[in-house]
C-alpha cells in the first residue's frame, strides 16, 4: 500500500491508501501480541491498546507534532471477537482526531478504558479540539471512519455515544462475558 501510495499524485488516493494501511497495521499489531504471548483466543486488551496508541501516534508524529495523547487504561483481558473491533474503533477515532480536531493548533487526545459496573466496560476516545458540527448526525454522516465505528460497535453489541464537551467525545460501552 505504501508503494502504491507513492506512485500516485492523487492526494485523495494517497489518503485512502494511508487509512487502509493504518487499519492493516492495527490488525498486524494484534497478531504480533498474540504470537508473542502464545495466546490465540484472548489477550490483555490494555497492553494491545497502549501499543496501538503508540503506533497511531507515531504515524502522525511528523505532521502533527503539537498533539499530545494521554491514556488511562485498566487491565482487561478480552476475547479476540471483542478486542479486534475495539482496536479498529480506536484506530478510526484517534485518526479522525489527528486529522480533523485541531486544525494545526495544539491539542490533547485521550483514550480511556474503564469498568462501569460488574461486566460492563467503557472505551472512550476524546479530544479537546473544535468538536463535531452542531448539527452532526451519525446516520447522515459521509465519514467512512465513523461508519466503521458504528458498524463495529453494533457487531459487539456495544452502545455508541457521541457528544461535544470542549471537543468531540466517543464512548463505546460494552459487556464482557
List each language-model region with its residue ranges.
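Glycine-rich nucleotide-binding loop
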Residues: 108, 131, 165-171
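Glycine-rich ATP-binding loops of the HATPase_c
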Residues: 156-163
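Short beta-strand/loop element within the Bergerat-fold HATPase_c
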Residues: 106-119
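C-terminal beta-strand of the catalytic ATP-binding
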Residues: 172-177
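Glycine-rich/acidic phosphate-handling loop/turn and adjacent ATP-lid/helix
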Residues: 120-146
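Conserved short strand/loop->alpha-helix "switch" segment adjacent to the catalytic nucleotide/phosphoryl-transfer site
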Residues: 43, 61-94, 98-108
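Histidine phosphotransfer helical core of two-component systems
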Residues: 1-29, 34-43, 47
Amino acid at each position: 500500500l505504501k508503494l502504491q501510495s507513492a506512485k500516485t499524485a492523487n492526494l485523495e488516493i494517497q489518503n485512502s491508501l494511508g487509512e487502509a494501511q493504518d487499519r492493516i497495521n492495527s490488525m498486524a499489531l494484534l497478531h504480533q501480541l498474540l504470537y508473542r504471548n502464545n495466546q490465540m483466543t484472548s489477550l490483555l486488551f490494555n497492553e494491545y491498546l497502549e501499543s496501538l496508541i503508540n503506533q497511531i501516534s507515531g504515524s502522525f508524529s511528523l505532521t502533527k507534532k503539537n498533539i499530545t495523547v494521554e491514556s488511562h487504561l485498566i487491565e482487561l483481558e478480552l476475547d479476540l471477537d471483542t478486542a479486534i473491533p475495539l482496536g479498529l474503533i480506536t484506530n478510526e477515532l484517534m485518526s479522525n482526531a489527528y486529522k480533523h480536531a485541531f486544525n494545526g493548533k495544539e491539542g490533547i487526545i485521550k483514550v480511556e478504558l474503564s469498568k462501569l459496573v460488574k461486566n460492563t466496560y467503557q472505551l472512550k476516545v476524546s479530544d479537546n479540539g473544535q468538536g463535531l458540527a452542531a448539527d452532526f448526525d451519525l446516520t447522515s454522516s459521509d465519514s467512512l471512519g465513523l461508519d466503521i465505528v458504528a458498524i463495529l460497535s453494533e457487531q459487539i453489541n456495544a452502545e455508541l455515544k457521541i457528544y461535544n464537551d470542549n471537543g468531540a467525545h466517543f464512548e463505546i460501552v460494552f459487556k464482557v462475558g
